Amino acid sequence: MACYSPRCDSPYPYADWDDCESVSSLGSFGCDYDHHEEASFQDPLAVGDDDVFEEPERVHGPIVDICKVDRMSEEEERMAIATRKAKEVAKELSETMSGKLRWLSDFTCDKPGPKRRKKKGLSMVDYPTLGSEAPAGSRIKMSKIGKGCTLVMASGGTRVEGSHPLVREFNGEKPPKNVGRKSGPAWFGYLSAKNATDKKTGSKQSDKEVEDDWTFVSKKGKGIQPEDAKPQGVKHQHAIRRDDRHRHGMRGTRYGAPNYGYRYQQQQCPVQGQQSRGQWQRRHCEGEGQWTQRRPAQQQQRPAQQQQRPAQQQQRPAQQQQRPAQQQQRPAQQQQRPAQQQQRPAQQPPQKPLRKRKPPPTNQRIVKPQKPKTPEPQPPQQDWFDSV
């Protein structure tokens, strides 16, 4: 059945695989295939043989829709040209508008502006000249406008990328909110044609202000007042919440004192000034203000430490006195503990806050224990372990 090339006459046809490189699966079934002339095999699909691959006949008739324009009347032809031009104009307009609006998503629009202005309205950055001379890809020319001016957008146009409140409202992502006015969105100047009548004042805009259906409305009696252009979250009424006053929120009002933005005012706190320092320490976070409780205890430990020094000075002359000197140190350490125990009842119990503030408890009120009569401490010499 299967015919192999005479070089591969072993009982296992693929035993010598190095000699039989040209043997293929097709060659084992059809003997008329020449193994040594592989290029003579032609793919019927590649040649396009009609017997192997038939395709339906292509009808090369004239397409009627292409030639239809010639047979149209002049009016229809004019309409077709007008619609085509309108589509091109609309496409070009959308490109230019997206180019003009690119400044809104720029990072400079989110900056709060110069430091002297505390309002969070539209910042006084350089606004673009909305002329058509700047191509869509290039950087838009900037020009300053007046301090109280507001940018008013025309209706229509493409979506704008950006998280600025005006951008999001222009895209229609959030519903307009009443800011400082009885009705209407936060900005409403949808001017769709030149010399359009402003909706609020009814006055006609001049040709200089209206340019490419985009308008800068100044605050001199025309159009939108600058209060209307603020982003949604900022309302400048006089009744302002305390946590809006500073960026740290209500942090300073924890103790009832209106010290905005300051963390802790221990000395000037008018409400809870009567409480002792142990109460202050309990209110603080860990590691904050705990030194106030340790201070009196440290001053009571000092006479106990002065008792340790003569004990060390007695150790210096001879090493045999180390052990009795260490036994003298132990009662000195035991005197530290009652010194700390004396300090705890010395705190005042929390009283009701009075209007007059008493001075805080100082170290002078604590009765210092009498120093035991010891020889005066000598000037510091070498330590006893250095003399060994």
From Swiss-Prot:
List all Basic residues biased stretches.
233-251
Task: List the residue ranges forming a coiled coil, or say none.
Answer: 68-96
Pfam families, sorted: DUF5892
UniProt biased composition (Low complexity)? 265-279, 293-346
* Stretches the record annotates as Disordered: 162-388
Recorded superkingdom: Viruses
Q: Which InterPro entries match?
A: DUF5892 (IPR045411)
Entry keywords, A to Z: Coiled coil
Protein name, per record? Uncharacterized protein 89R
